[in-house]
From Swiss-Prot:
Bilayer topology: Multi-pass membrane protein
Transmembrane segments: 1-21, 35-55, 67-87, 98-118
Name this polypeptide is given: Fluoride-specific ion channel FluC
Phylogenetic lineage: Bacteria, Pseudomonadati, Pseudomonadota, Gammaproteobacteria, Cardiobacteriales
GO MF, one example: fluoride channel activity
Pfam families, per the entry: CRCB
């Protein structure tokens, strides 16, 4: 039951954080939804890389792993919204859709690697 509630609370907080951060980014900058989701997903990749490496060094980190990795970052990042935004962007401008796809995948892998590297340096 600990896992259920820990993931449930983390996922809810992650989803709400994603929503408000995307609204904030779109209001405070000139970017639209696909690019706001890109930034959020990259931040999430950095976070999941960092926290997975950092928490793996702790002996009693299972609740934190459930809360942060599965829950919060699972709710914060979103593959389904990414794919929907990608298709919508592709209907408007195909080159931008491919750029967005490349930045999500390449940037996500890079950010996850940097997160691992940062955690090992701490």
């Amino acid at each position: 039951m600990y896992a259920f509630f820990t993931i449930f609370i983390g996922g809810g907080l992650g989803a709400v954080s994603r929503h408000y951060l995307s609204v904030y980014l779109m209001r405070m900058t000139a970017i639209n939804a696909p690019w706001a989701i890109l930034l959020i997903n990259l931040l999430g990749c950095l976070g999941i890389g960092f926290f997975s490496a950092y928490l793996s060094r702790l002996t009693h980190a299972q609740l934190w792993q459930w809360f942060l990795l599965t829950g919060f970052l699972g709710g914060f990042t979103t593959y389904s919204t990414f794919t929907l935004n990608l298709i919508q962007l592709g209907e408007i401008h195909l080159a931008s859709a491919f750029l967005n796809l490349f930045l999500h995948l390449g940037g996500g892998i890079l950010c996850c690697f940097v997160g691992f590297w940062l955690a090992r340096a701490v």
